[in-house]
């Protein structure tokens, strides 16, 4: 009898977890039908490139790893919205914990509260389940680039483990092509990724060629990454190029980068 009662209780909990409005899952958590705005990165890149076309100084807010810490993400967004100087926002990935469509939608709804255009990278958690398909519909390709104020931002998929080495991650053909594509429109470069070199997600068998292709970009200034949930920075390849880590939303810390004609500065914002 006691065992039967336990079974009934577990069954009731399962029903509640499936039907609860607050759950990050619906009945089909990996249903890939995406309602609402799609292809967000391409749409926002057009805005970013237009807004920054003639700017020689830009202010970029960089956030990462919001997962299901929605209140913390909302706090970061509110703080960014109070700063009129921000030109655009970069999210370095891990919008979700499980790659579910509902998680993606909940994150998108909050990011669309930003008063400035934004782009979103794909994190390793965002690849889980049918996350790759949902990300592609909602945001676009997971390797992409854009040019703002004569600076090219290269957004590199480095989530190699999630692809079980079945695809080229990082994609050196993409990097090689981007180094010269639209070369007349940019003089400097910034590389962005979710997982940094030497992390467990990165394909550390290709560290040397990765550094080679990244360093091929004209006047590479710095690199950005998330994944580790901390504020940190490293000169991974001892070549003067600093890789800046951006903290998870739960830490209520993010970075603002100011790019000027003579260089750049960065500030850690603590809420």
Question: Where are the regions a protein language model picked out?
Answer:
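Extended active-site neighborhood of metal-dependent phosphoesterases/phosphodiesterases
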Residues: 38-39, 101-186, 206-219, 233-267
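Short histidine/acidic/glycine/proline-rich micro-motifs that form metal-
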Residues: 66-68, 94-98, 124-126, 160-162, ...
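Short acidic, glycine-rich surface-loop motifs adjacent to enzyme active sites
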Residues: 83, 179-200
């Amino acid at each position: 009898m006691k065992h039967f009662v336990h079974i009934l209780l577990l069954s009731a909990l399962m029903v509640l977890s499936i039907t609860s409005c607050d759950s990050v899952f619906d009945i089909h958590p990996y249903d890939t039908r995406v309602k609402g705005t799609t292809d967000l990165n391409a749409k926002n890149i057009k805005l970013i490139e237009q807004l920054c076309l003639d700017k020689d100084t830009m202010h970029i807010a960089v956030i990462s790893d919001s997962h299901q810490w929605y209140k913390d993400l909302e706090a970061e967004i509110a703080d960014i919205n109070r700063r009129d100087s921000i030109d655009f926002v970069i999210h370095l990935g891990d919008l979700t914990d499980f790659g579910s469509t509902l998680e993606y939608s909940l994150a998108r709804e909050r990011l669309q509260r930003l008063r400035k255009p934004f782009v979103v990278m794909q994190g390793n958690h965002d690849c889980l389940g049918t996350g790759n398909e949902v990300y592609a519909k909602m945001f676009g390709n997971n390797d992409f680039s854009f040019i703002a104020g004569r600076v090219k931002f290269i957004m590199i998929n480095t989530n190699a483990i999630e692809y079980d080495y079945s695809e080229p991650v990082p994609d050196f053909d993409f990097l090689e092509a981007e180094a010269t594509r639209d070369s007349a429109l940019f003089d400097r470069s910034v590389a962005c990724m979710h997982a940094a070199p030497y992390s467990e997600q990165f394909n550390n068998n290709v560290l040397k060629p990765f550094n080679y292709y990244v360093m091929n970009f004209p006047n590479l200034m710095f690199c950005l990454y998330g994944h580790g949930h901390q504020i940190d920075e490293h000169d991974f390849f001892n070549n003067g190029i600093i890789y800046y880590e951006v903290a998870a939303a739960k830490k209520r810390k993010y970075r603002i980068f100011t790019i000027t004609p003579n260089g750049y500065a960065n500030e850690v914002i603590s809420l």
